[in-house]
Amino acid sequence: MRWLVCLIVSWCSLVPLGATVGQSLNSGDPCQTPSGTAGTCEPVKNCSYVRKILKSPDFSHYDTTYLDTLKCGDLMVPMRKKPIPLLCCPKFSNSPTCGAQQLADRIYFGEETERGAHPWAALLFYNVGRNRTVPKCGGALISERYVITAAHCTVDKPNWKLLYVRFNEFNTSSADNCTTENDEVICREDYAVESIVPHPEYDMHNISRPNDICILRLASDVTFNDYVRPICLPFDPDVQQLPIVDEIFTVTGWGETEDRRPSDTQKHVELPGLEHEACNSVYAVANVTLSDKQLCIGGLNGSDSCRGDSGGPLMREVRGGWFLIGVVSFGARFCGTQNLPGVYTNVAKYLDWMETVMFVERYL
């Protein structure tokens, strides 16, 4: 803590208080960073984004210059000669169009998902060797540039190379990139992956798979439309505090079906939430210990997420919008086994880390 205070004092003494980007706001006022990200004008102590930059062992003159561009005003404090600089603290927020299901009636219990029903669903394609490119995991679009998936989809197979993320996949066995429905031409959309950031505490050798979450930054922005749009993240405390047990959640993906073969088409299934303690007792026989950062969902005979669904979204509908609640992590060896639920990474527990990755690592 003393080191952080020293860094803050040093930075404040290095940055001319008059060197601003033309803003003169009050604490708590909305602002915009030079990159166009919405934020709030805050003192350094209230902005975890800035504090993490200051605490970086690689803090440099470049970072000082960058922090100077964030200055948005001054805070006058009684008994203090110099004002406290206010910085535009970026806030990650959901897209206004997130979670909207514009099209389609839903078809449940492992049936095909109608086009546009879950437009945030992503399919990850890998080079697995011998010039073979195949889909192996799922993901969920959360903004124009970022996709959430499971860490084991990027860490556990070091010989696999993640090539691109596909949206609006209608049939993996079809060679046609576009199809026509009701006189409308609808095409697959592929985006190269610029960077892969698995959670730093994920351990591929831990069979309990804690921290099984990963952020993919795409090489270019995704253009939203009726068939490709982001899902909402559970920033709202009211969403985070909703009950889990006996509530209904939806999983979507292209994983194995009841005949043990990958599905050519996107499917989804509805599953109930379970007591955490009960789930822990079920998996204890396999020496698996689950934390409060994991969710237990399912355990119905014949209905489950499965191999190939890994990294895909666990969703719930709240007030007409869809929220990303979990990420498919692991389950029983034989999918859909009665009383053996699937395990999912609890997204709400990782929102702070996600903000750090999406904002801080862009500049350090």
From Swiss-Prot:
Residues 30-89 form the Clip domain. Keywords: Disulfide bond, Glycoprotein, Hydrolase, Immunity, Innate immunity, Protease, Secreted, Serine protease, Signal. The keyword Glycoprotein applies. Residues 107-359 form the Peptidase S1 domain. Expressed by a subpopulation of hemocytes. Glycans are attached at N46, N131, N171, N177, N206, N287, N301. It is found in: Secreted. Disulfide bonds join C31-C88, C41-C72, C47-C89, C137-C153, C279-C296, C306-C335. One of its GO terms (molecular function) is serine-type endopeptidase activity. InterPro entries: CLIP, CLIP_sf, Peptidase_S1_PA, Peptidase_S1_PA_chymotrypsin, Peptidase_S1A, Ser/Thr_Proteases_Immune/Dev, Trypsin_dom, TRYPSIN_HIS. One of its GO terms (cellular component) is extracellular space. The record marks R106, I107 as: Cleavage. The keyword Disulfide bond applies. Induction: Induced by infection with E.coli or S.aureus bacteria. Induced by infection with P.berghei parasite following ookinete invasion of the midgut cells. Its main location: secreted. It holds the Pfam family CLIP. Serine protease. Plays a role in innate immunity against infections by parasite P.berghei and by Gram-negative bacteria such as E.coli. In response to P.berghei infection, contributes to the clearing of parasite ookinetes independent of melanization, an innate immune response which consists in the deposition of melanin pigments on invading pathogens and parasites. This is CLIP domain-containing serine protease B15. It comes from Anopheles gambiae. The lineage of its organism: Eukaryota, Metazoa, Ecdysozoa, Arthropoda, Hexapoda. The gene is CLIPB15.
